[in-house]
Amino acid sequence: MKTSGSQSTLKDRLLLVVAGIVIAFTGAAGAEVDVSQSPLFVGSNVPGNLALVPSVEFPTVISVANLGGFTTGSRYVGYFNSAKCYKYNYDADETKRYFYPVASPAPDASFRCNDATLWSGNFLNWAATQTIDPFRSAMTGGYRVVDTPTTTILEKAVGERVNTGNFPRRTVTGSTVIAGVMASKWNKVMIRIDGLQNKMWITQDLDLGGNTNATGPRYEYNPSVHALDGSCLERTGRQCDRYDTDAVFELSVRVKVCDNAAGLEDNCVKYSQGYKPEGLIQEYSQRIKY
């Protein structure tokens, strides 16, 4: 009797469950409503919300952005404009040293400036850009170290570790190639970024060192003094004690952008007193809350 009663009770429960399911589906079908498959908004004037959780730690911040050797005619990404030539502004105050674009001449079709006083923006992108720099440029317009109403200067990311695996030392050979992209007449240039914070070292013949010290003397590059053409740096009487090919030169990797006199970059936006570089965050700031 117990077994029969238990089976009867179980059947009754199953019937109730099935009946409930049928009723639920029947009711749902009778009250069917079209629901938008697009994201729902409170109103047309209310911006959406976006949470950004980027992974931009080691080694992304300090790794090299433009891989491989330098190839004339290839375009490289970075804070510099590949379609512009630059001069270097030297000042006794290191924070006031930077590259700035010139209105003329413009690079040729292979991004070469071919001028003993000019640097190719495309070459500087290849030489000095860390992976985080294009990311910052795309998101915010770049890392501003000078940000006044009329002047904007961007600075490369900090290269804090001595590690050639993340940012290899670079070498470019050939006086013709170098003369087209640097303010130099050397026949070879070796470049170091790793461990130098916001700076770059260049030399023709010296070892760039395994830590923060090179194997030879280091000079703060001043274009009005240093021609980078094999000329003499130090003399004793008529005797030249050191040529510029046997020295290391230090440059600060900063660049002036959105200079209307030299031509604006594509991401420059007009403000009341000048132009500023913007990225996706500024572009969509009126439509999205971050």
Residue ranges of model-derived segments:
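N-terminal secretory signal peptides that target proteins for export/translocation
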Residues: 1-11
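Short N-terminal leader segment in a subset of presequences, especially plant chloroplast
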Residues: 9-13, 40-41
